[in-house]
Structure formats: C-alpha cells, structure tokens
Amino acid sequence: VGETIFEVRNLNAGRMVRDVSFKAHAGEIVGIAGLMGAGRTETTRAIFGADPKESGEILVDGKTVKIHGPHDAIRAGVVLAPEDRKKDGLCTKLSVRDNIALPNLDLLAPGALGVVRSLKEAQMVEVATKDFQIKMPNAEVDAASLSGGNQQKVVVSKWLARNSRVVIFDE
C-alpha cells in the first residue's frame, strides 16, 4: 500500500454524518457503504464543501486543508462526481467544451487578466473527450443532448483533466 494521500478525521455534518474517519492510500479505492439514508451522500457533500461541516479535519498529502466550499476542495485537489449529474454535475444548457473548461478556468486562464488560452482549452477538451470516448458530433453540442452515460463521462473527465488528487464518486 502506498502513502496516505487523503484522510478524513472525525467529520461531523448534520444528523447523518457523525464522527466519520478514514484514510485513502495512493492507488487505493475506498468505499463508503450503508443502506439508503445512512448518510453516504451527506458525507461526500460535506467533504467536498457542498454542505457545511460542523467539525472534523481533512488532510491531503498529510497537510490539513480548510474546505469551506467546493472551490476550496477543488483547489486542494479533492473533487466530486455527484449522484445527480444533471442537477449537480453538469450545466446541461452549456456545451461539452464549456462543461470541461469551466471548472478548469484557473488552469486555462492563469494570471491577473484571466484571459483563456484557447489552444490550451482546445487541447484539454480534446484529450478529455478522447480519453473517455465521449460519443458526440463535436464538443460544441449541449451536454443535455448526450446520453446519460456520456453525460457522466463529461462529469468525470472535467475533474481528471485537472489531475485531481482525490476523486469522490457518489453512486
């Protein structure tokens, strides 16, 4: 087993998430199991910062990270492929290109001016769509026009395009 890259200590959030602790090592897949209503989704959302946590500590590569919202989690390399892709994972009225580029603007438009490097964006989108074999006529089609499986591929590809350290999949 590799080094510990992700750790949650004593996470509490609402009535469903009580004293959750676990570690994930490099290359390891960790599952959170439980019956429907056991708090799996609530746990993932609290870790990602989509819902507030009352207490607990989150560590990435051995360093405590402060996650007050999804932007903090993304910056720390922790991302979420949510249970409801249409509601929480995609902007269905936007193109596949935009869905991949939007969460990666910090990588595509570095610097004070915030100008998107279109060549870098095109390369990122091309690699992401080819790696995941997203079936579509082109990257300009609305995400809503894709099949459910291809929509899910867009959700995952946008996060892997930024080389995230930890990807949380909620069902």
Give residue spans per PLM region.
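Glycine-rich phosphate-binding loops of nucleotide-dependent enzymes
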Residues: 1-171
